[in-house]
Amino acid sequence: MIICKTREQIAKMRDAGKIVAEVLALMEEYAKPGISTAELDQIAEAHIRKSGAVPTFLGYGGFPASICASINEEVIHGIPRSDKILQAGDIISIDVGATFRGYVGDAARTFPVGEISEEDARLIRVTEESFF
């Protein structure tokens, strides 16, 4: 069953999505060699909370983090850890959710870490093109 939303509800949904987009932009900026996925999680959570939102994933079904972070061949929804350090040549997939005024924004992106192989760059490019 589809529930039609009011203009006000749609605006709130957009606001939640905007926060997620801002977090993903930060993740792209900070996803550099030497940073841990736990540090990325802390950056994401700080921005979500500063924006007046709540990290949607944190505590959901016992999930211990604000983002899901998966490096290279790891399946999405990886748990950020302080011992998972990004290396040049990695690709990282990050999933972010933010609940704002009762509405959830949720999106995932994959980013290169430093210089990556042509094959990995093509994978990211083709995947992005299929969505946009």
Mark where each language-model region is.
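Active-site neighborhoods and metal-handling regions in enzymes and metal-associated proteins
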Residues: 1-132
